[in-house]
Structures are given as structure tokens and as C-alpha cells.
């Protein structure tokens, strides 16, 4: 039997698998001719972009609920090796699987430098498990002796994830530490750049800065973290901040599986792909999501985001089947780009274009953000094969 292996079950991986199943149906390929298999280290599709939120109950979807109805198999294991010449992947269990075509969609991870104490005492919201660990840690602090350090969180990295995390935390801390003991919850956002939201542009920056003020978030810019301890952080300036919680949100890098391929990668570790999501220089391999640097238009490459990962997955899934059956491949182009950043109780900010011009802010932008986070980025959850495959069509959604 011919086999398509998809590595990863995040936004790109899920939609690549469903996109492949949809295209097989569309071509009326007889059942049992092509096996579509997802290999990932968890039996879940995680809504990773919501990990900064206080309520994580809707952030994890059993893969069986969305792959099963589509006839897509799933293997719960971490892929440890890719043999591109032999067209075979090996997993942490020792099992190996041959493939006729491969879609690499193993995502990205937060970069944690070798700072003293970071690995031992730092937290993150990079994964669902990491977000749960942070949640449990904060709940544990709230049940213990109430000190200023216990009620203080330092967030490192003032990019999008760091800003959303910092803006969400004041509400969480006030709910957890509302015991009337005279201790005021404190959130401090740190970044080595001279200002927060360095990638958000001049239009959005004042909105973000005001939101941080409104949320009571302190900032330290132009400094970096030198060391982390159970009691806080030491900054490059020499300042020490007493805090029982340090959340690391600084920097992302593509899955280490990209390092196994004999081709060039960009500064984020991403593979170069062509307009059809084929990995340039590696036969029979496609890539989608955070592991791939795909051209969105004549000037811009894809951004590590579900905004780009989902359509990249859909197109890769369609094209991997087209490639198997000598059908024309579909070029992916996304003619627009938006950013909708959650600012906690201050609402949100919505920007359009690569220059990130603000078009909405406050409560209206918050409504859009909530719609994205709770509906737009989810697969159909009604168990309908028809609905799942229809949602996997190779198309680009309109602006939210």
C-alpha cells in the first residue's frame, strides 16, 4: 500500500492530514490504496495559541475525534530520525515507517538559552503541558504563605506571546491572591530590545504600551536576564527582581528534525519550500507550518503562526496527493496579513498589512480575537467526515 506520513498534529499537521484525505476522496481513490498516517508525540491536537489563557479546558482536542472520521491513522510516538534517501522515519519507540510521500509539520519550540537556573526554575506557555504546569504552580503559590515574591511573575520576552501572557496574568493573579493580606500582585515584562512589541511596528506600539499600563504591567526594556533562581531573576543591569514565577517567552525555533535534512535552513531553522510546499532539495517531501519558510507573496515569507500554518497544511495535504497521482499542484499565495493581539482586560489590537497598521483596538478587536480563538481556528468537532473534509479544502480564509 502507498503511504503518506505526516509528522506533527498541530495546526499544519492536522490540516495536512485532513487535506490529503479530502483529496483522495475528490479523486475517488479506492479505499485501501493510500494510507494517510499522522505520527506525533501526543494523541491530541492542541490549540497552542491559547496557552496563555487562564482556562485551558478547550485547548486540547483528542485526535481520534478529528482524524478517525476522516479515516486517517495516528501513531503516538516522537519521530527521532528521518531517512530521506530510504524514505523512512523512526520513532522513539524504535518502530519505523516507510513512506512514499512525507509532510513534515513538526512545528517549533521556544528557545531557552543555557542561563543559570532557567531549565530548573523557569516556566513557559509553549506547550499545553507547560501551560498546565504554570497554572498548577500559581495555584500552589496562592495556597501557601502570601509574600510579594509569591504574587510576582516575571515574563521574559516582549513579543506577541510575551505581551499576551503579561496582559492576561494580572487578572489571574488578582483572582488567585485576593486574600486581603496587603500584597499586591505584580507582573514585570522584560525584553532586551529598547521597547516592547518590537515586531509590531510604530502604529501598534502605543496601543500596546497603553494596554500594559492599564493592566498594571511593569516593563524593563534594554536589559536581558542573566540568571534565574527559585526566588527571582538577576538582570544584565545588575537589578534583581524577587519573583516566585518566571515565564520564558523569548524566541522561537523550528523543530530539530529539520537539522537532519541535507539542505539549507534559515535563521529560525526553517526549510526552504517552493510554491507548492515541496522541500527544495529533498525528493518526496513537503513541509508546512513553522518548519517551512514559504513565500506568501513576492516580498514576504510565512510567519510562525496558525494564520499561515493552517492554510499551508491544507495545501500541502492536497499537493502531496496530487504529486502521488500526477495531478497539477496548487500554488499557495496569501495576499493579506493581519495580527490580532490579546491585551487582557484592555481588549486587543488588530493590525493589517506587513507594516501592521492598526485598524481596530479595545473591545471591538477583543471580540474579533475571541472569535478567532474559540471558533475560527478549530476543526469541526461534530464528528462529521463531510464537515471535516470540507474544512480541509485548499483555500485561504478571508480576513477575520
From Swiss-Prot:
The UniProt keyword set, sorted, is:
FAD, Flavoprotein, Oxidoreductase
Name residues in a coiled coil: none
Explain how, and how many, cofactor molecules are bound. Binds 1 FAD per subunit.
- Provide the cofactor list for this protein: FAD
Q: What is its EC number?
A: 1.6.-.-
Q: Which Pfam families match?
A: Pyr_redox_2
What name is this protein filed under?
NADH dehydrogenase-like protein MT1860
| Signals that turn on the gene | A member of the dormancy regulon. Induced in response to reduced oxygen tension (hypoxia) and low levels of nitric oxide (NO).
Q: Name one GO biological process term.
A: aerobic electron transport chain
Its family remark reads:
Belongs to the NADH dehydrogenase family.
Amino acid at each position: 500500500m502507498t503511504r503518506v506520513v505526516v509528522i506533527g498534529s498541530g495546526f499544519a499537521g492536522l490540516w495536512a492530514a485532513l487535506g490529503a484525505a479530502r483529496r483522495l476522496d475528490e479523486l475517488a481513490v479506492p479505499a485501501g490504496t493510500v494510507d494517510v498516517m499522522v505520527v506525533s508525540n501526543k494523541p491530541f491536537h492542541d490549540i497552542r495559541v491559547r496557552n496563555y489563557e487562564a482556562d485551558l479546558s478547550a485547548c486540547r482536542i483528542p485526535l481520534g475525534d478529528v482524524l478517525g472520521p476522516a479515516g486517517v491513522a495516528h501513531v503516538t510516538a516522537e519521530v527521532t530520525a528521518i531517512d530521506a534517501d530510504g524514505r523512512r522515519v523512526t520513532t522513539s519507540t524504535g518502530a519505523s515507517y516507510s513512506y512514499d510521500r512525507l509532510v513534515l509539520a513538526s512545528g517549533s519550540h521556544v528557545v531557552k538559552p543555557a542561563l543559570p537556573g532557567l531549565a530548573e526554575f523557569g516556566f513557559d506557555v509553549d506547550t499545553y503541558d507547560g501551560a498546565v504546569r504554570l497554572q498548577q504552580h500559581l495555584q500552589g503559590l496562592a495556597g501557601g504563605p502570601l509574600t510579594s515574591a509569591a504574587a510576582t511573575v516575571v515574563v521574559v520576552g516582549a513579543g506577541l506571546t510575551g505581551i499576551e501572557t503579561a496582559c492576561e496574568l494580572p487578572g489571574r493573579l488578582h483572582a488567585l491572591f485576593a486574600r486581603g493580606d496587603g500584597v499586591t500582585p505584580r507582573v514585570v515584562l522584560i525584553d532586551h530590545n529598547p521597547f516592547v512589541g518590537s515586531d509590531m511596528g510604530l502604529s501598534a506600539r502605543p496601543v500596546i504600551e497603553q494596554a500594559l499600563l492599564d493592566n498594571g504591567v511593569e516593563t524593563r526594556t534594554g536589559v536581558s536576564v542573566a540568571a534565574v533562581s527559585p526566588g527571582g531573576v538577576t538582570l544584565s543591569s545588575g537589578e534583581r527582581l524577587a519573583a516566585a514565577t518566571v515565564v520564558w517567552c523569548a524566541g522561537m525555533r523550528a523543530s530539530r528534525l529539520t537539522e537532519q535534512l541535507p539542505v539549507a535552513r534559515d535563521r529560525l531553522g526553517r526549510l526552504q519550500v517552493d510554491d507548492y510546499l515541496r522541500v527544495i532539495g529533498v525528493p518526496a517531501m513537503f513541509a508546512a507550518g513553522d518548519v517551512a519558510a514559504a513565500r506568501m507573496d513576492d516580498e514576504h515569507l510565512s510567519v510562525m503562526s496558525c494564520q499561515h500554518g493552517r492554510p499551508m497544511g491544507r495545501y500541502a495535504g492536497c499537493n502531496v496527493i496530487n504529486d502521488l497521482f500526477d495531478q497539477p499542484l496548487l500554488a499557495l499565495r496569501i495576499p493579506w496579513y493581519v495580527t490580532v493581539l490579546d491585551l487582557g482586560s484592555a481588549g486587543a489590537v488588530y493590525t493589517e498589512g506587513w507594516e501592521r497598521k492598526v485598524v481596530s483596538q479595545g473591545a471591538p478587536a477583543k471580540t474579533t480575537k475571541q472569535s478567532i480563538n474559540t471558533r475560527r481556528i478549530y476543526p469541526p468537532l461534530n464528528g462529521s467526515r463531510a464537515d471535516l473534509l470540507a474544512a480541509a479544502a485548499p483555500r485561504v480564509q478571508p480576513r477575520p
